[in-house]
């Protein structure tokens, strides 16, 4: 179930955000709505599949480096990947969220910028970290999101820092040049 060659997905973009936390709040609200709808309108299908729909109250949030520290201190797991979460770490983090918060979901934020796409905004307080997140559920990453760069010069600087040819992204960066609102 980890990698599928075909799947259906849902992407959404939000403009005029203050931070990535606005995107996370919207995602949490959408998940609550979808789960409630499925519970109310699909009981026969749920019974047929022997599936349970999780209860979503609040979704705990943990920073990437804090998550790595907890996995080592609480579970004795020494990570070999300093830029991302391995599958076993995703399972452990979901176990931690269930034990500590009674939640089957957990947001992991502030991944190393080097791991995130060129359009992910870096944290002004620590530019080595991106203002981005993954949402984990029952041991699997189910979404990725974050705040995107909206400033033209900031986007051009990040492309240059990553030694990417800005000309190849001209149609993308043109939007920034003429005015892009804060978005995620």
Each model region followed by its residue ranges:
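Short helix/loop capping segments that flank catalytic or ligand/cofactor-binding pockets
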Residues: 1, 21, 116-119, 144
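Class II aminoacyl-tRNA synthetase-like tRNA-binding/catalytic domains
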Residues: 1-17, 174-180
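A generic structural motif
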Residues: 11-22, 139-141
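Glycine-rich, acidic/polar active-site loops that bind/position phosphate-bearing ligands
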Residues: 19-22, 26, 35
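Hydrophobic (often cysteine-bearing) scaffold residues that line and stabilize catalytic clefts
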Residues: 23-27, 63, 151
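Metal-assisted phosphate- and nucleotidyl-transfer catalytic regions
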Residues: 29-138, 161-181
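Conserved phosphate/anionic-ligand binding catalytic regions in large, soluble enzymes, centered on
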Residues: 141-149, 180-184
């Amino acid at each position: 179930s980890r990698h599928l060659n075909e799947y259906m997905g849902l992407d959404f973009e939000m403009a005029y955000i203050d931070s990535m936390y606005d995107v996370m709040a919207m995602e949490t609200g959408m998940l609550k709505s979808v789960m409630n709808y499925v519970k109310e309108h699909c009981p026969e299908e749920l019974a047929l599949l022997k599936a349970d729909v999780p209860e979503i109250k609040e979704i705990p949030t943990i920073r990437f480096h804090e998550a790595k520290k907890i996995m080592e201190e609480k579970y004795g797991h020494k990570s070999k990947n300093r830029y991302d979460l391995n599958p076993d770490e995703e399972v452990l983090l979901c176990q931690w969220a269930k034990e500590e918060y009674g939640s089957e979901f957990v947001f992991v934020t502030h991944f190393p910028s080097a791991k995130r796409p060129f359009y992910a905004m870096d944290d002004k307080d620590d530019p080595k970290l991106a203002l981005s997140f993954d949402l984990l559920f029952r041991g699997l990453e189910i979404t990725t999101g974050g705040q995107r760069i909206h400033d033209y010069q900031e986007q051009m600087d990040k492309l240059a820092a990553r030694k990417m040819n800005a000309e190849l992204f001209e149609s993308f960066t043109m939007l920034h040049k003429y005015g892009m609102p804060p978005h995620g």
